[in-house]
Amino acid sequence: ESKRLGLRSCLCYEVSDRDGEEKCLQAIQENADFITECQKNQDPMLAAMFGGHALFTISDKTFDRMVAANNGRTGYHIHVSEGMNDVYDSLQNYGRRPVQRLQDHGILGPKTILGHCIHVNTAEMDIIKETGTMVVNNPESNMGNAIGICPVLQLHKRGILLGMGTDAYTHDMLESLKVFLIIQRHNAAMPNVGWCEAMTMLFENNAKMASKYFDRKLGVLEAGAAADVIVMDYKPFTPLSEENIDGHMLFGMMGKNCRTTIINGRVLYKDREFVGIDEDKINAWTMAESKKLWSTLNDRAY
């Protein structure tokens, strides 16, 4: 679907022990097969990672199986120290903190993304830095789950490649940008921090992370880079210049201001209308599939 719609996608399937060994093995195989398929097809718009849920739902045996199935072909995507239960489980059952445990299994590396990392200590931060592993902060999700705040300022000072995500809590990255800034300032009790980190994470580091998986330079307007452009319908009420554009993006613009979207040179959304996409058909399919899923999970009809 992502290919048909013209989206650039790096995907994986979440491995977990929660549903028993059979489902776990199927999830591992799904990742392995998808990685093989991506390597075979060499589609410049589609890439694969190896997905894992979180350390408290993945045993050492399962980690070993994941690493064997991956065979060094790609990086991993996993939630780490999102809540203290992840830390407690790791220490109680394995005698290691989460990041140490990932290092023991060879999960870390320059193409691996650790989501959240709220409760990592300084020793774990050093390991993340030494291995070149990436971290993605999801401020709204963390606040919604009331699990804490990622130590972004400390991670940033260590030179860790730190990106901004949503954990599917929202689809508006500019909304996340605003929330990130105010929660980091609130947490630090300092009204002058987080500005540079916010802009760097969203507009520079996210592109750097994606570039590790796609053989194109992303996130810049220059010859040879991917032609990814959005046009914003934004009317400023104060002077707008290259000196204060960051402030306008933080405090003025919203996702709904997007008027046109171009991905890899293809116009997908023009003047607030999708191009070559039957929105009603997709919405109907999504509703039907969600009803099937909810019915299966909740044992009732919708």
Language model features by range: what are they?
Residues 1-118:
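Metal-coordinating catalytic core of metallo-dependent amide/deamination hydrolases
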Residues 2, 50, 79, 114, ...:
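Divalent metal-coordination and catalytic microenvironments
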Residues 6-8, 70-75, 107-110, 127-136, ...:
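Glycine-enriched alpha-helix->loop->beta-strand junction motifs that scaffold or abut catalytic
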Residues 14-17, 82, 139-143, 167-169:
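Short, acidic/turn-prone active-site loops that include or flank metal/cofactor-
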Residues 84-96, 124-129, 146-155, 170-186, ...:
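Histidine/acidic-residue-rich catalytic or RNA/ligand-binding cores of hydrolases
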Residues 104-107, 111, 151-236, 250-254:
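His/Asp/Glu-enriched, well-ordered alpha-helical/loop segment
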Residues 120-132, 138-144:
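Long hydrophobic segments that form regular secondary structure
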Residues 203-302:
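Active-site microenvironment of metallo-dependent hydrolases
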